[in-house]
Amino acid sequence: MGFRKRNAKRSDNRSSAKVIMGKPASQLSKEEKKILSARMAEIRSENGGKNTVQNTIPFLCMYQDGVCQVSENFFSLTVQFYDANYSISEFDEQNNIFSKYCDVINLFDNTIKFQLTFENQNRSKAKLVKTVQIPEQDDDFNSIRKEYSEMLTDKLLKGSNGQSARKFLTFGIESTSYKAARAKLMSIKNDVIKGFKAFGVEAELLDGRQRLEALYYALNPYRNSPFLFDWDEMLRAGMDTKDFICPPSLKFNKADFEIGNAYGAVWGMNILAGELPDEILKDFLEMQNLFCVNIHVDPLDQIDALKFVKKKLTNVEQMKIDEQKKASQSGYDPDILPPAIKMYIEDIEKLLGDLNSKNERLFHISISLRAYAKSKKELKLLSEMLKRTCQKNNCIMFPYDYRQEQTLVSTLPLGYNEIPVRREMHTSGIAIFVPFTTKELFQDGQATYYGINTLSGNMIRANRSRLKNPNGLILGTPGAGKSFSVKREILDCFLTTVDDIIICDPEGEYFPLVSALHGQLIRIASNSEQHINPMDIAIDDYMFSNPMEVIANKSDFLISLCEIIVGGRYGLSAEERSVIDKCVQRIYKHFIENEPTEDKMPLLSDLQRELHEEGEVALRVANSLEMFVNGSQNLFNHRTNIDMSNRIICFDIKELGNQLKKVGMLIVQDTVWNRVSANREKKKITRYYIDEFHLLLKEEQTAKYSAEIWKRFRKWGGVPTGITQNVKDLLSSQEVENIFDNSDFVYMLNQAAGDRDILAEKLHISKEQMKYVTNSGPGEGLIRYDKVLLPFTDKFPQDTQMYRLMTTRPADLA
């Protein structure tokens, strides 16, 4: 794909990259410039001041938009694509993924050559570790931060996050100019990305810098220095793009080569069997070495392909006739053919039928394997491992003697090919190198730890705030680890963010953790001295934001509260709802007009008094409030007397009776609304955790109010999380069912049989995937983050201060 003379003269610096000209403004720091300068000095020293290493890299020009001019008339683009959950999908879904992947391969006609590159590359461990390290702060929690950082680092290094299996699809065309090539390549790129998107695979175009970065890591194994590059710096220093990506040195031997401080080799691979297992590529990439599988593909015109196959069939038929003649002359039965000829005829006839009637095309392909090692001995051991893997999959590996330079550069994602050995293969044959196993979820920057990917062993790390709907559900049977998972997320967020955290705790489970974090524990009970006022509003939000919305929300809440208090089969009448709304409007109008302060906040008794003044229509509601105003349950007829400014607040409602517990949980939710309202002005996130969430979903009024939170919280900077063992309660009404639709984060631990069926239907989870929440151990299950679904395992170290703060197991607390 594209040609050049070996050892061609190095291209002029000004033509090696096309840059949008302007005032140079380097993006590299002084320290990075020092590192780059040292690297260039090393390259000059290793090569005697000549550019021999740069000349090995076979392209003429890299454009900022990602178009690469490989040779005078050949241009290419590279798309990086990501993983899909192939391994844990059911057979039908695997077939769908396979079929759609075939569609992507069939996008390319005989004018477009393409290259599939699957490469294990090292990620900087120091950089990775830095992402999970929590900086110390001037507070009392640095010992916990240190312990948590050490735990995360340990889990990170035990996994394979230090390596990334990158997947590139490079395609190229012949063209007389960059402008004409770009237009066609960008059109092809759009079709390719759309093709991947059709089966849920993310794909993105690599721009010029990203392509250079991919080349840098392919050519610099085991180097700790990161890729450093800047277009303006290149112009200022009079450098070439190849100066930024080439290895310090290259020395080619008969069957291997030395590259910088490492050793490498490229081998060819021939397929012996008619069919291959779909895990062949997975077997190679799971070897945890710096390893690359490369497939160059040259599509045939469909008419030429049919002619080619028919000619092959004619030749084999002639072989058959010749064999029959020999058998007849020797006195044998002419119908008895050698098995190889019989099988060959069957294969060609099947291929001809597939080309005529199925979604199959024919291609010339060449397959190569590239590996790096730190020593020759290690490289030899690696080659033996590769041979065994090839044999296991009915393939044979062979060396490219005296062609290591040509084959090395052919493994780079450029669309350039000097690999001599090639064979014919149809669409399904190429697609059987299935590049999909399991999706990964590891976000850089501020993110929360959620366990280890059961399939890959990699850490799961994500930031819910980045989701369109950060609302979440944590679901599981008793003993599955719900409370522990919630506390782990709370602890992580407390240590790594500035978010406010509020917990509704119906079972009194969160006290040890909240106390250790110096949080505010609010005990709501008939005999408690701590009070929260259900008539509270956020005064600043009213005065400076949206007063009508504040009062409308408060009215909606108080109507729901009165409906629970009044009870009965039919709840409040339309007239009663209207009169409550009227009274609420009047109460807060008077409050606002008379220098509003916290110590003048209205009480439930004010609402009762206003209702009495409305006469007969409001009498039933006013009388129902009596017990909560002057009776035994008047704990909510007091002004708030607790510090609500603490960053972490836990409402302990364990001692409330069942009916009062619903009232308490609803009042807590309204208090959270007030906090979210106040924080919205500060652009601060408020996380709200509701344990025993099913208690709120059983009553129409509290269920409706909860559904409203799930619909509106995100706009105000709220992140609610419902925790429950009763999944069926989430289907109690269409309104409540919408909670599922408005939750882009679902953390599923072990599930009861009936709940598994509900989750499978609502979240479109396959039977194969549901195995991970069937009789699973504590801390094991499935996580859904937007469209990503992964099995996870969280074996939290028990010999830590953190574990003792979070566990609820009686054996651990004894």
Task: Please name every model-derived segment.
Residues 474:
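Hydrophobic anchor at the beta1->P-loop junction of P-loop NTPases
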Residues 1-438:
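Extended, folded cores of ATP/NTP-driven motor/assembly subunits in large transport
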Residues 84, 91-109, 117, 121, ...:
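P-loop NTPase motor domains
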